[in-house]
């Protein structure tokens, strides 16, 4: 039978229903009956607020009174040691010319991992004998141009190819 027929009015139907007694109205699923408080304890606690936990402190602590660690956990020491070890070594950088950029005689160089990418760009400008007015555009893996303040060690760790940081360069913008 069609649910929108008068015998079975739909839930959203704007049609007036037939005169029904109060007992038959309570049995309709789309008409809420008057709400009674149930004696069931689960329904009484359903809308009750969650009580606050007592932590034993009457007044909030200031930042100067907060707990200070006297030593770091072992795993934190290892994580710090691993992070520092990345920036202590040397990184191999391979320069690749793009478009009509001049080709370097030696394309592979080593640089300290703690240096910023700015050092790589300055070194490349020096090798290419660029004037101060000349532009050099550098891209890692021919994909993106890193910021000058990026660490070479972090770039190498994330984007190395065959343990080398591939830096493509051009005298004109090569990519958007």
Curated annotation (Swiss-Prot):
Keywords on record: Autophagy, Isopeptide bond, Membrane, Protein transport, Transport, Ubl conjugation pathway
Family annotation (SUPFAM superfamilies): Ubiquitin-like
Q: Which Pfam families match?
A: APG12 (PF04110)
Q: Keyword Cell membrane, does the record have it? A: no
Q: What is its main location?
A: membrane
Q: Where is this region: Disordered?
A: 1-59
A GO CC annotation recorded here is: phagophore assembly site membrane
Per UniProt, subunit arrangement is: Forms a conjugate with atg5.
Name the record gives this protein:
Ubiquitin-like protein ATG12
Which species does the entry assign this protein to?
Aspergillus oryzae (strain ATCC 42149 / RIB 40)
The uppermost taxa in this organism's lineage are: Eukaryota, Fungi, Dikarya, Ascomycota, Pezizomycotina
The encoding gene: atg12
